[in-house]
């Protein structure tokens, strides 16, 4: 008898859960649309050489050219390391092989410092655009953020992922701008 009562209770609970209204659909009727855009993660094809002083703090950049399944673990082997320790600069310039429309996803492996670390991202349709500063009169200041952000700074979480950007690009430059830090 006790088992029958328990079964009846479970069935009543299941019916109550199944019968609940979708509050998002009800509250957004007539002012929402389904997104049919698909998402695809693309691995860069090659590294573009940068002057030596800009890459002094870069170890194992080839790891960025390998497919990544998106799963970070505390033992993720063979990662790229960017370090600004001892006053070094840490920059990489990636070539995706063809112009894409979208943004980038950054994944950070485990590290000693658990705070979010700042990186500067520059998206460009050419190497010179990805290397240039936005606006100004400097010789390397030929790009703009007018139609979409292509030069921005963001924080990369500890043992986590972040996605940003919405632009047309083929090349992506990533600079670790956090002083005295290491990003894996």
How would you describe each model-predicted region?
Residues 1-5:
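Positively charged n-region of N-terminal signal peptides that target proteins for export
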């Amino acid at each position: 008898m006790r088992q029958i009562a328990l079964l009846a209770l479970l069935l009543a609970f299941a019916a109550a859960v199944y019968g609940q209204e979708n509050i998002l659909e009800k509250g957004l009727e007539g002012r929402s649309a389904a997104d049919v855009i698909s998402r695809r993660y693309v691995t860069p094809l090659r590294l573009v050489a940068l002057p030596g002083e800009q890459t002094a703090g870069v170890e194992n950049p080839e790891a960025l050219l390998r497919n990544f399944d998106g799963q970070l673990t505390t033992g993720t082997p063979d990662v790229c390391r960017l370090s600004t320790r001892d006053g070094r600069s840490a920059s990489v310039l990636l070539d995706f092989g063809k112009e894409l429309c979208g943004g980038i996803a950054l994944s950070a492996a485990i590290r000693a410092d658990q705070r979010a670390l700042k990186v500067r991202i520059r998206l460009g349709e050419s190497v010179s655009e990805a290397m240039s500063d936005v606006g100004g009169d400097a010789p390397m200041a030929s790009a703009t953020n007018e139609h979409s952000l292509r030069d921005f700074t963001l924080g990369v979480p500890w043992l986590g992922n972040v996605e940003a950007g919405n632009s047309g690009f083929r090349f992506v430059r990533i600079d670790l701008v956090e002083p005295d830090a290491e990003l894996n």
